[in-house]
Amino acid sequence: MEARDIILKPLITEKSVAKMSEGKYAFKVRLDANKTQIKQAIEEIFGVTVVRVNTMRVRGKLRRQGKYIGRRSDWKKAIVQLKEGDSIKVFEGL
């Protein structure tokens, strides 16, 4: 699996922006990706040193479209802690 296939997109929320000062960044990743793959992908894409990776599965919410009930897809969130002094340039200025 390619590194860019594992990391789907960065998560920009109020909570994740607050954690950036601690060197923690949040990403949406593939459901089948493990912590080792996520760490290698972040290091390859952004050229930083990853200290810790925490992952969690997020269940999809129920949604209605008129009388029909559907469900959004489940997804996986990864919170990556970088070595002190490292930062990801994509998130600069947030």
From Swiss-Prot:
Keywords noted in UniProt: Ribonucleoprotein, Ribosomal protein, RNA-binding, rRNA-binding
A GO CC term attached to the entry: ribonucleoprotein complex
Any one GO molecular function term: structural constituent of ribosome
Gene Ontology terms: biological process: translation
InterPro entries: Nucleotide-bd_a/b_plait_sf (IPR012677), Ribosomal_uL23-like (IPR013025), Ribosomal_uL23/eL15/eS24_sf (IPR012678)
Keyword Isomerase among UniProt keywords: no
Its job: One of the early assembly proteins it binds 23S rRNA. One of the proteins that surrounds the polypeptide exit tunnel on the outside of the ribosome. Forms the main docking site for trigger factor binding to the ribosome.
NCBIfam families: PRK05738.1-3, PRK05738.2-4, PRK05738.3-2
Similarity comment text for this entry: Belongs to the universal ribosomal protein uL23 family.
Oligomer status and interactors: Part of the 50S ribosomal subunit. Contacts protein L29, and trigger factor when it is bound to the ribosome.
Protein name: Large ribosomal subunit protein uL23
Protein source organism: Symbiobacterium thermophilum (strain DSM 24528 / JCM 14929 / IAM 14863 / T)
Gene name linked to the record: rplW
